[in-house]
Structure formats: structure tokens, C-alpha cells
Amino acid sequence: LTMSNNWISAALMSRINPQDFLRTLRDFGINTYGIYPSIVLCLGPNEASVSEMVSAYSTFANHGIHTSPLFVTKIEDSDGNVVANFQPRMNEVISEESAYKMLDMLMSVIDQGTGGRIRYKYKLDCPMGGKTGTTNRNSDAWFMGFTPSLVSGCWVGGEDRDIHFDSMRMGQGATMALPIWAYYMKKVFADRSLGYDPKEKFDIPEGFNSCVSEDDVDAGYSL
């Protein structure tokens, strides 16, 4: 995961029922309508919106609990009286320990992997994790990133699938999407009124073991 070695994802997928994997995607907030359960799903051949991806990644930062996106939290009348309040739907998708295992791997993407320029080029040294993404023919460049309190993402591409970058060097997520996310996070941390603390740390589950056992893989807990 740190270096985007997709063959590892393919090896894991060969040990997981594609139908079960599809159910897991739904649990994480990905719209799976029209997606055929196939082993190639691990390589991301189907489309997903930035909103869906942010929703999915928030599960890792939120201790394994998925929170459905909510764009309106309350409605007030012209006098300031609250007409209605809305609460997001939440459900536990994976255990807190499994969520932190994913966090641990995604943090290594930034600390020593494909997202390394977050540190050495953009000088963001706070606790954070992320993942770069690049599709075939360099048509899409992705970067999903998160801190303990904020999950966000960036996609660079075109609605027309024939639009693509000329080369992997220019079209990869680390080159096209990551810089946008990095500048955005710099703005977020610079604006103290937003209340995001760059020194905030991720909560480590009590008794956390960073090793993934064979039983975890067979049971699908490492998803």
C-alpha cells in the first residue's frame, strides 16, 4: 500500500469472495449499483465520486465507524427558531483495531511512500495519512488525505474518458492531485478560526498490535 504495489491487492482479493467485497464497499458508503462482483474490483475499475471516497476514508479516521454524508445539520426560520435538526447515520463497519491498522498503513504512504512529497516538498509535518491514485492511460489523478479531525480528497481529470495526461510522470496522483490537497491543508491550518489543530494525534487503540494475522486476512478484517 505504501508504494502502490497493486499486485498485493490482487493477491488479497484472490482470497476474498468478490460478493463479500462488494458488500464491504456498500458499508463504506460507495454506490455499488451496476457493479459486477469480480476479482478485478481491487484495482478500482469502477467510478466513484470524491464525496463517496471521502465518506469511505472517514471510516478509518473515525475508529471504524462510517458516517453517511450530511450537508444540512439544521433549519432555522427567519427569527432564528430551529425548525428541524438532522443527525448523520452512523454504523460500525470494522473494528477500531482494524481501522487503526489501515490508518497505520495509510500514514506510511505519506511518511515513506508515494505521498512523501507532502513532507519533503510541502513541509506538512503533522500526523496525517493518505493515498495516491492513478488510472489507466493517466486519465485520473487522485489523492485522498486525512488528519484525526478532517478527511478530504482531490480528483484531477475530465468527464470525457478520452481526456488524459501524456505520461505517468505528469498524470499520477502524486503529481497532479497531491499538490492541490497539500496547498488546501496549508490554508486550513493557517486559518485558526476553523479549529483544526496541526498537532492533533490519532488515537491508538489499547493493546494495538500492528501485525496482520492469517486469521485476519481469511476473515476479511484487513479490508
Question: What are these model-derived regions, one by one?
Answer:
Residues 1-62, 108:
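Active-site-adjacent helix/loop patches that line small-molecule binding or acyl-intermediate pockets
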Residues 2-3, 49-222:
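A penicillin-recognizing enzyme superfamily signal
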